[in-house]
């Protein structure tokens, strides 16, 4: 049943208005917390992946729009509605396609579970920009990668902007973080090696091989490792990898942003 928003201070609206994403992440510690999914497409993909809705926040005009089919499936989940201007005032941002959903997080699988029976994985080191995270996940899902692993310094894939930019593909490709007890890169790289993966660092070095290198492309199990823009991958990681890989470029361009580079890398090295 939907309720017209009359009191911005109502506690049931706290998850949308007065709680940061970090606070939502830790909402039920030590149990998994909450995330906010934005737009009907993203919400629908989260629901199909088994995430449970807590409540909906929907712009008036969208109650009969794209949101309608989703809402019909969850008649017992609380819903709140108001005009666009009031929702912007409440949340502090412009809603994409007029719909938000607060959802419970699921427990994350282990790295070993994620990597079982897969041959191509993306490993992200300290990618902090949620837009880049979303773009990378979308490319990984579309371009034949089997899973994504993240170091603890990465932005959370379920943060609202990351999930929205990914178009919900964060719910379509398996992913997890390296365990906090594992020291990155020492323990993480050892885990990848123990799981049978050859490692490929995407980095511009004099000794880099081209992304079309035959030996690289023929590896049975390959982990493609990408780092943050600016500093790039740590030198220790590059030294520990089996390959250092570069993307050939023209017109004097010396680099691509990490999201663009990931798309090229996944297309060339993904399992297809």
Where are these regions (language model features)?
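Boundary-proximal intrinsically disordered activation/regulatory segments immediately upstream
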Residues: 1-66, 154-155
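Short acidic-hydrophobic, aromatic-tinged amphipathic segments that line or gate anion-handling sites
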Residues: 2-9, 78-83, 174-184, 245
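Glycine- and other small-residue-rich loops at beta-strand/loop junctions that grip anionic moieties
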Residues: 5, 35, 125-126, 151-152, ...
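Short, aromatic/basic amphipathic alpha-helical patches
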Residues: 65-76, 237
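Glycine/small-residue-rich loop that forms an oxyanion/phosphate-binding "nest" at active or ligand-binding sites
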Residues: 71, 76-96
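Structured adenosyl-cofactor binding patch, chiefly the S-adenosyl-L-methionine
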Residues: 99-101, 139-143, 157-171, 235-272
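Active-site/ligand-binding-proximal alpha/beta "capping" segment
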Residues: 200-252
